[in-house]
Amino acid sequence: MVEFKLKDPLLDQLFEAVLLLENVDECYRFFEDICTVAELKAMAQRLEVAKMLQAEKTYGEIAERTGASTATISRVKRCLNYGADGYKLVLERLKSETAADRRQQLCSRDLSSSLGTRKKT
């Protein structure tokens, strides 16, 4: 079991509140109230940096695409290698969800195609 360095009741409450959000629109509403634009952009940037590091992109490619400094890229890389595996957990789930979404779209398209090609009797 991972021991969390930041564990405290206020953070527990915050994370429980986040878990209550049901969709992206609700996330926008909550995070726009609780974070500054700069804080949100920084978190989004770090997630993209982690994604690109996992894809073995170079620091130069990452900096150019995201605008992240090499210090930020290094911090994210350190977390990927030695952190609590939070980035890995989320990126794997995002990848799985994206794959599941693609499968769902393909199934829907295939179903629509097969229904559209049936002869009417």
Residue ranges of predicted features:
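General nucleic-acid-binding
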Residues: 1-21
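Short alpha-helical "recognition helix" segments of helix-turn-helix
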Residues: 61-66, 73
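Short, solvent-exposed alpha-helical "recognition" segments
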Residues: 78-93
